[in-house]
Amino acid sequence: MDHTLHLHVPFESARLADIAARALAPDPLLRPEELSVSFASDGASLNIKLAAIDARVLRVATNSIFEALKTVVETADELDF
């Protein structure tokens, strides 16, 4: 796939990064032939790798991941993780 994006999202702790990776990973991709996504925690960072067939698919996927990540962070804040 021609378009890639690697994100490194810092968290306050390795535990929160791991929770975020596990919370985001289960969502199945609707078109795996157009997009691949991986989530991995590395210490207190969440590493996200995306690869897409074109810029539009990458942009839409990135927006979706940021929305989901926002929900994970807000939930962790509310639950005082």
Swiss-Prot record:
Quaternary context: Component of the EKC/KEOPS complex composed of at least BUD32, CGI121, GON7, KAE1 and PCC1; the whole complex dimerizes.
Pfam families for the chain: Pcc1
InterPro entries: CTAG/Pcc1
Transmembrane portions of the chain: none
Keywords assigned: Activator, Chromosome, Nucleus, Telomere, Transcription, Transcription regulation, tRNA processing
One GO CC annotation: EKC/KEOPS complex
Residue stretches in coiled coil: none
Gene Ontology BP terms: tRNA processing; tRNA threonylcarbamoyladenosine metabolic process
Functional summary from the UniProt entry: Component of the EKC/KEOPS complex that is required for the formation of a threonylcarbamoyl group on adenosine at position 37 (t(6)A37) in tRNAs that read codons beginning with adenine. The complex is probably involved in the transfer of the threonylcarbamoyl moiety of threonylcarbamoyl-AMP (TC-AMP) to the N6 group of A37. PCC1 functions as a dimerization module for the complex. The EKC/KEOPS complex also promotes both telomere uncapping and telomere elongation. The complex is required for efficient recruitment of transcriptional coactivators.
Protein name: EKC/KEOPS complex subunit PCC1
Family to which the UniProt record says this protein belongs: Belongs to the CTAG/PCC1 family.
Subcellular location: Nucleus; Chromosome, Telomere
PANTHER family tied to this protein: EKC/KEOPS COMPLEX SUBUNIT PCC1 FAMILY MEMBER, EKC_KEOPS COMPLEX SUBUNIT LAGE3
